[in-house]
UniProtKB/Swiss-Prot annotation:
Lineage: Bacteria, Pseudomonadati, Pseudomonadota, Gammaproteobacteria, Moraxellales
InterPro entries membership: Aldolase_TIM, RibuloseP-bd_barrel, Trp_synthase_alpha_AS, Trp_synthase_suA
Organism: Psychrobacter cryohalolentis (strain ATCC BAA-1226 / DSM 17306 / VKM B-2378 / K5)
EC number(s) given by UniProt: 4.2.1.20
GO cellular component, one term: cytosol
Gene name per UniProt: trpA
Chain's role: The alpha subunit is responsible for the aldol cleavage of indoleglycerol phosphate to indole and glyceraldehyde 3-phosphate.
Membership in a protein family: Belongs to the TrpA family.
Catalytic activity: (1S,2R)-1-C-(indol-3-yl)glycerol 3-phosphate + L-serine = D-glyceraldehyde 3-phosphate + L-tryptophan + H2O
Keywords per UniProt: Amino-acid biosynthesis, Aromatic amino acid biosynthesis, Lyase, Tryptophan biosynthesis
PROSITE patterns: TRP_SYNTHASE_ALPHA
Protein name from the UniProt record: Tryptophan synthase alpha chain
Length: 272
């Protein structure tokens, strides 16, 4: 059983929902990032999605795309992100870490080498936005051999054939994209999301977690009532926008705002 699977099993036994924050590796600066991960756990994160900075993030909305730009400007590479996860693992051996990114940086490192580095760093799951499940065969095999889960996206516009491929090949949890568009989009139709989540759960035993458009306690509670977990990114990383990454006070204040949002989201989920 992987760390992700074990965490969901524990949450189910406790009748709790997973809170999964998304943050960009190296944002706002590399020296603060590991501390940020630990603070997220202290404020209720059950697992964490870590974005891999990439120069052409086609599925990212402006908030997350800018986070990637800040991380790249600070010199954060995919290898650096893995080093940060490894440092996090020195103190936290329980909280699952999922890497979310794009294939190009992984292909540069090489699938075999990348998966080995992930295992050595303590990564638990991988979500490659631009890797279709039908083309993921060898990559999926490498991950399975190293006890890591490969996670795929489902969305309102996923075609039936692709949907079945995702349900067949996905591990850990299903990431359901609640909106048509990019990360950080607005207008969340909770009734439609509830129907979609119920339909997915009728086809798989995997937990279903919902991301895109969850910003506050109200949306967290509305979605958490139907999903096994929520994924929140833009509402957190937007706090690092327009600050001086070298200003210790500004970074600390931004992180305080992020943790206040985490407390709000955790409280909403725990009230269900």
């Amino acid at each position: 059983m992987t760390r992700i699977e074990s965490t969901f099993e524990t949450l189910k036994a406790q009748n709790k929902k997973a809170l999964i924050p998304y943050v960009m590796a190296g944002d706002p600066n590399p020296s603060n990032f590991v501390g940020l991960l630990h603070d997220l756990v202290k404020h209720g994160a059950d697992m964490i999605e870590v974005g891999l900075p990439f120069s052409d993030p086609m599925a990212d909305g402006p908030t997350v795309a800018l986070a990637g730009e800040r991380a790249l400007a600070a010199g954060t590479s995919t290898r650096d992100a893995l080093k940060m996860v490894k440092e996090f693992r020195q103190q936290d051996t329980q909280t699952p870490i999922i890497l979310m990114g794009y294939l190009n940086p992984v292909e540069i490192i090489g699938y075999d080498n990348f998966v080995s580095l992930c295992e050595q760093s303590g990564v638990d799951g991988i979500l490659m936005v631009d890797l279709p499940p039908a083309e993921a065969g060898s990559f999926t095999q490498h991950l399975t051999e190293h006890a890591m889960n490969e996670i795929f996206l489902l969305s309102p516009t996923t075609l039936a054939e692709r949907r079945q491929q995702v349900l067949t090949h996905c591990g850990g949890y299903i990431y359901y994209v609640s909106l048509k568009g990019v990360t950080g989009s607005a207008t969340l139709d909770t009734d439609d999301v509830a129907k979609q989540v119920q339909a997915i759960k009728a086809e798989t035993d995997l937990p279903v977690c919902v991301g895109f458009g969850i910003r506050d306690a109200t949306s967290a509670k509305a979605i958490g009532a139907h999903a096994d977990g929520i994924i929140v990114g833009s509402a957190l990383v937007q706090n690092f926008a327009d600050i001086d990454a070298n200003d210790i006070t500004a970074v600390a204040n931004a992180q305080q705002k992020i943790m206040a949002k985490m407390d709000e989201l955790r409280g909403a989920l725990d009230s269900l």
